[in-house]
């Protein structure tokens, strides 16, 4: 949240600005929106089964592993400096609804923190996050193939990082090449 708030305030991001069409957004934006909608479906199912711990773990994994460690880390240069071009606007219009949806999804688990987060995100809104509807699942933006390809990229990256640690090769030291054998086309 603090990353988003800092740059959104500097750039004067307006959530009501005309949305960049999903088809024109970069693949990483479409991936995180797809994953968010998968999360919405899974968290709602966990809540319906009274599996609060499961819902919390799903939200935590999404925020830590996918939003923070992948989306923000890989896309942070899109938020830095320069004018508000389509790419930067797309990044804001992707991260903003992700944060709002997470605040809504996690509100039953962390009521006070999520209420503060929601009210900080949705400026001018005086209604508590507990009075607004849970985010709706949108099947039209879910791309399971894209989610699977990104999961594969994440696994490959994790393995490379583990090998670097084992060989004591600093992550700042570029590798001339890395070969990843592929046994199956999937």
Please provide the spans of the model-predicted regions.
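Secretory-pathway-linked proteins and extracytosolic
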Residues: 1-4
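Acidic, turn-prone loop/beta-hairpin segments
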Residues: 11-44, 73-159, 167, 173-184
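Hydrophobic residues within the alpha-helices of tandem HEAT/HEAT-like
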Residues: 63-64
